[in-house]
Amino acid sequence: MPSRAAILPDAAYRNLKTATAMKSFHKELWMDVPERMGFVNITRDVEAALAESGIREGLCLVNAMHITASVFINDDEPGLHSDYKRWLEELAPHAPLSRYRHNLTGEDNGDAHHKRQIMGREVVVAVTGGQLHFGTWEQIFYGEFDGRRRKRILVKIIGE
């Protein structure tokens, strides 16, 4: 059986041989939201991490490292954030605590786990020319659903 390189066109093989090694960079951001539920625009923090990484082309993963928090992309418009809070509370109300079997363990955050599930765990954004490659109005947000304690966000950037 021929080697993989043998079945590539000459130009593709030359590009493989001259490719640079991919860089990997990570940074942790810390959040301390004083309310039970809140949204924080972290776009500038992620942009600062990207600048620090020196990576010009690649991918940027931003991940909430707690099971009652989320990272998502949307518009930074206060009415939308208010709508999200109302909608999430309608879908997974905090009270009554007895609504959630999870709370039988002594916890009081069963709703926060559901809210996180709805809003998602992480986002991945393309990096182009050393910038986050967003669509119009897109911003990165941290969503907190069981606040009042310090939590961590992972920013992982890979590329060249």
Predicted regions and their residues:
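Active-site histidine-anchored catalytic micro-motif
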Residues: 2-160
